Amino acid sequence: VPCLDSITTSRVLMTMDQYLKDHGYTTLIINTNHDEMRELTSIEQLWRMNVDGIILMATAVTMAHQNIAAKLDIPLLFVAQRYGAGVSIINDDYSAGYEVGKYAAYMGHRKICYIGVSGKDEAVGIYRKDGVINGLRDNGVSSVDLLETDFSLEKAHLIALDYLKKKQPTLFIGATDNIALGCLKAINELKLKMPDDISLIGFGGYETSQFINPSLSTVRFNNEETGIKAGQTIIDLIEGNVVDNLQLIGYTLIKGQSVKDLNK
C-alpha cells in the first residue's frame, strides 16, 4: 500500500483483510510511503517469500512495474490504477468526474477552479480531471481554471489562498476531500463564506466531510466493495479461475450543502 494514514486505504484494507481471513488466507501488509523504488523491491521480496499472490494498491503504473509484473510466476493484482497487460480494480473516476462537472453546470456555476494532482497518478490526475472537464463542457461550461497540488490539505490550502488573492471563482472543485478542505481553509482565512461566496465539491466521501457546516458535497466511492472484490479476485487468480481484466467500482454523488444554486 502507498500509505497507512489514508481513510480510503484503510477502508479497502479492512474489508479485503477480513475477506481473505474468512477464506483461509493471511494478509501481509507493506507500507511503501509513496516510494516507487520501495514498491518495486517489496514486490520482489514478497515473490521470494513464496506468497500465493500480491495485491498492489498503486499510485502509478510505470514501465518498471510492467517489467516486474511480466517476470512474476504468481498473480499480481493492481488496485486503484489501470494496468492494461493484467488485472486491475479501479474506481470509475471518469464517470464520477463527469457527474460532478454536470452537477456544477446544472447548479449554474461558470467561474470554476479545479485543483487536481499530477498526471503521474492516472486515476485521479487524468481520468477524474478529464471527467470533470468534459462534464462541464458538455453542459455549457467551456473553460475552467486548472491548478495542481499534491494530496496534502496544507499545500492545497496555500495554492487556493494564492489563487483567491488574484481571482474569485464561484466554485472550487477539489480532486479529493482533503484538497477541498484545503480550499475551505483558504476561504475561511479570507473571511469569505461557503457556499454564499464560494461553493465547494470534493471526492472521497469521508465521514468527517459531513460534519463540516455546511456539509460537503462529495463523491463517495465504494471502498468496501473494492476490498471485497480485491479479495475475491486474488483468490480466483490463485486458483486459476478466469476473471475480468478491468473491474470498475461504483460511486455515489453526495449532494451536501456546500454548493449554492446560482439559478435562483
Show where each model-derived region lies.
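Short acidic active-site motifs
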Residues: 38-42, 63-65, 155, 159
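Short glycine-centered, acidic/aromatic-flanked micro-motifs in structured strand/loop junctions
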Residues: 1-3, 32, 58, 116-119
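Bacterial carbohydrate/catabolite-sensing allosteric modules
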Residues: 14-26, 47, 71-78, 82-264
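Short beta->alpha connector loops
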Residues: 33-36, 57-62, 82-83, 178
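Active-site-adjacent beta->alpha loops and helix N-cap segments on the catalytic face
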Residues: 61-72
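Residues that form or flank phosphate/diphosphate-binding pockets in enzymes
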Residues: 7-8, 37, 64, 123, ...
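Amphipathic helical "hinge" segments at domain boundaries
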Residues: 1-45, 49-53, 130
